[in-house]
Amino acid sequence: MKLQKPKGTQDILPQESAKWQYVEEFARETFRKYNYAEIRTPIFEHYEVISRSVGDTTDIVTKEMYDFYDKGDRHITLRPEGTAPVVRSYVENKLFAPEVQKPVKLYYMGSMFRYERPQAGRLREFHQIGAECFGSSNPATDVEMIAMAAQFFKEIGITNVSLELNTLGNPESRAAYRQALIDYLTPLKASLSADSQRRLEENPLRVLDSKEPEDKVAVEGAPSILDYLDEESSAYFAAVRSMLETLQIPYVINTNMVRGLDYYNHTIFEFTTEVAGSQLTICAGGRYDGLVAYFGGPETPGVGFGMGLERLLLVLDKQGVELPIEMGLDAYIAVLGAGANGKALELVQSLRAQGFAAERDYLDRKIKAQFKSADIFQAKTIITLGESELESGELTVKNNVTRQEVTVAFEAIKTDFQGVLAQIGL
C-alpha cells in the first residue's frame, strides 16, 4: 500500500506555510486592535456540543461530521466549526463571572473537519479564523464585528469585497416568519429537491439558501423576513444599518440569506468577493443571543464570525496579492574541509545567539554548490571558513547582493556581527 495523506487533506510545505503564517499574524494584529484575546479549544468535542448547538437537522450534523465512539464509549466528534466549542469553553470556565471584564472578546484559529466533497479552497480538514464577543446586546457590537472583518480584508489587500446583510429577528419574529414560509412552501413541496422537502418539515428557513435550481425557483416569490419583524427586531436591524452607514461600510440586504447554523438571531452577514467571475464567500457570521444559556450558562448575548484560511489564501492568490514574506537568511557559512567543521558549528551558533538567522553547510560539498545554496536561501551574506581561515583567525564576509567583501577576525563575528554587517553596507 502506498502511504498518502487522506482524501480532503493537504500538506502545507514550508514556502506555502510562510504565507499561512503571514495571514494568521495579520489577523492577530487586527484582533489586537479591537482588544480580542486568543482562545484555544480541543479539536474534538463531545458530540452533543455540536449537534445540539449547530442543530440536529443541519447538513453539518446529518451529513458532514466526523464522529466516533472512543475507547470509553464516549460519543466524540471532530469540531466542524469554531463557535460552539468557544461557547462551551466560555460556560465551562465561567467567563461570565462578575470579575471577568465585559464584553468578553475572543478569537481563535485552528483546524475544523467536515466530510464533504473536496474542492478548491474547501477541504475535509480546513482551517478557520474566527472571533466571538460575549456580553453585549448593543447593535454597535454587531457593527464593530463587521467593521473588524472589513478592515482585515481591506488592509491585507483583498478587493471587490461585498457585504450581504440580513436579520432573523428575535425568537418571536423568527417563529412568525417560519410559519409564513411553511404556508408558502407547502403547496410547492413536490417541486422541491429531496433535501428541501426534508428541510421543509424540520427547518424551513434552510430552503431559502439551497443551491438546487428547483429550490431557487420555488423561493423566488417567498415572503420576506422583513415583513414579519416585530417592533424590537425592526428597531435593532435599523440601528445596525444606520451604524454601518455612519462608518461608510456599504451593504446589500439579502433576505434569502439564513446561514447554515440554527443558533443565529437578529443580525447575520456574509462577505463575498469576486474570483474568476464567481462570487466566493470569505467570511460569515451573526448574532446568537440564546447559545450561552443553551449550554447551561446565564442569559448572555453573543456575536461572532468565521473565515476559512484556505479560501482567503486562494482569493489572495487569484487576485494577485503579493504577500511580503520574509524568507532569507542573514548569513550562510561555507565550510571547506573537515578541520573547519567544529569551528563552523561554533560560529553559526554564535550568530543565532546574537539574533541572526544563519545556516552552514553540513554536506562537505564543493564551494560552488555551497554558494548556490546561499543564493537559494536568499542569504544576505556569505562567510567562508576553511583551513586557511582557521590558521589566520580571519574570515571573509561577503555582501551577497553587492559582492562587497570585508576580512574580519573570527571573534568579531562571534561577538558583534551587526558591526561587521555595517562595514559591507548592511
Swiss-Prot record:
GO terms for biological process: histidyl-tRNA aminoacylation. The keyword Aminoacyl-tRNA synthetase applies. Coiled coil: none annotated. InterPro entries: aa-tRNA-synth_II (IPR006195), aa-tRNA-synth_II/BPL/LPL (IPR045864), Anticodon-bd (IPR004154), Anticodon-bd_dom_sf (IPR036621), His-tRNA-ligase (IPR015807), HisRS-like_core (IPR041715), HisRS/HisZ (IPR004516), HisRS_anticodon (IPR033656). Its main location: cytoplasm. It is an enzyme of class 6 (ligase). GO terms for molecular function: ATP binding; catalytic activity, acting on a protein; histidine-tRNA ligase activity; transferase activity. Homodimer. HAMAP family: His_tRNA_synth. This is Histidine--tRNA ligase. It comes from Streptococcus gordonii (strain Challis / ATCC 35105 / BCRC 15272 / CH1 / DL1 / V288).
